[in-house]
Structures are given as C-alpha cells and as structure tokens.
C-alpha cells in the first residue's frame, strides 16, 4: 500500500468528532486493515471533566495523559500533563507495525508533550494513511478535512469511510 492519504476530522467541542472517528476506525478494521494509534477520551468526576486518558486503539495500552489533580512542569489550561514515557513507547511500537494510523486528537495538549509530538510528527511524515481528529484551531495543507456539525454527524462516518476506501483502492 503506497498511497499517501491524510484525513482530518474537526469541529466544535462536543459535536461528535471522537464518535465519528471511532466508527470510521471500526469500519476500516472490519475490512481487514491493520490499524493502530491512540485516542484521548476525557475523564469526568461528578459531571466535571478532570482530565484525559490516552488509550491505544486496541485498548491494550492506557494511562493518564493529563489531570487537574496531578502536578507536573507542563500545564495546559487547568490540566497537568502526566503521561508516562513507557506508554508512549508502547504506542509508538504498535504504530510502527500498522498500515493505517488513527489519532484522536492532534491538539494543543498532545502537541505540548515532546515525546507525543514526536510520534505525531513521525506519523504525519512517514506513515502512508492517517485518520486524525484535529483541534478546530489547527489546520494542515495536505489531505482532506471533514468538519463535523450537528447537521452532518449522523452520516459523516460513512462519507469519510467511503472517501478513504475509494482513495486507497
């Protein structure tokens, strides 16, 4: 597979970007594609967001990315970055073996962690096919960007999946 394809998913907070991303990843997996990467779901406590985890797409690797309770030298907004370097190494190892890479999200928090930024740069520069959720204030010149809205979110996963399949076959 020599195709170079970049698919970016963006939109306002809470519109459904992660849901669409995970649906697209599941559809690609069901077609037999080798996929790895990571996503960063929020963690809530009593209805309030307290931080973010980082999970590999196969859910075998998981740890905290950032938390309001942790203390570290890197702080983004109210969150302290707490990611463990072992987790990053495990995710990087998985990524090196896959043909399609999924990332949720490429945003200020993820880019503030040097080792995580290194993985993101590696993926964007070296891997042939990337599907990524991108913070609404970040844009890339290469690839196709899909903007999630309340009006299109129920059909956008199919549109993105069909675009990817037609681009790589």
UniProtKB/Swiss-Prot annotation:
Task: State the EC number(s).
Answer: 3.6.1.15
The residues listed in the UniProt record as binding ATP, with positions renumbered to this chain, are 11-18, 100-107
The record's section on InterPro entries has:
Nuc-triphosphatase_THEP1, P-loop_NTPase
Query: Known catalysed reaction(s)?
Result: a ribonucleoside 5'-triphosphate + H2O = a ribonucleoside 5'-diphosphate + phosphate + H(+)
Single GO molecular-function term? ATP binding
> Which CDD domains does the annotation name?
RecA-like_Thep1 (cd19482)
Look up keyword Secreted and say if it applies. Answer: no
Q: Name one Pfam family in it.
A: NTPase_1
Top-level enzyme category: hydrolase
Any idea which UniProt keywords this protein has?
Answer: ATP-binding, Hydrolase, Nucleotide-binding
What protein family is recorded?
Answer: Belongs to the THEP1 NTPase family.
Role summary: Has nucleotide phosphatase activity towards ATP, GTP, CTP, TTP and UTP. May hydrolyze nucleoside diphosphates with lower efficiency.
Q: Which PANTHER family match?
A: CANCER-RELATED NUCLEOSIDE-TRIPHOSPHATASE
> Record's NCBIfam families?
PRK13695.1
The protein's name: Nucleoside-triphosphatase THEP1
Instruction: Give the species this sequence originates from.
Output: Sulfurisphaera tokodaii (strain DSM 16993 / JCM 10545 / NBRC 100140 / 7) (Sulfolobus tokodaii)
């Amino acid at each position: 597979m020599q195709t170079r394809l970049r698919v970016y998913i963006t939109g306002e907070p809470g519109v459904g970007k992660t849901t669409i991303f995970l649906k697209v990843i599941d559809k690609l997996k069901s077609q037999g594609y080798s996929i790895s990467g990571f996503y960063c779901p929020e963690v809530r406590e009593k209805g309030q967001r307290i931080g973010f985890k980082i999970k590999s797409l196969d859910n075998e690797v998981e740890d905290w990315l950032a938390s309001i309770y942790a203390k570290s030298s890197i702080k983004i907004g109210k969150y302290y970055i707490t990611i463990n370097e072992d987790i990053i190494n495990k995710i990087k190892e998985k990524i090196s073996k896959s043909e399609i890479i999924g990332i949720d999200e490429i945003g200020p928090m993820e880019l503030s962690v040097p080792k995580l930024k290194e993985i993101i740069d590696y993926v964007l520069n070296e891997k042939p096919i990337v599907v990524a959720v991108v913070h609404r204030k970040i844009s890339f010149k290469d690839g196709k960007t899909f903007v999630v809205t309340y009006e299109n979110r129920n059909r956008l996963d199919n549109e993105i999946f069909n675009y990817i399949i037609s681009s790589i076959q």
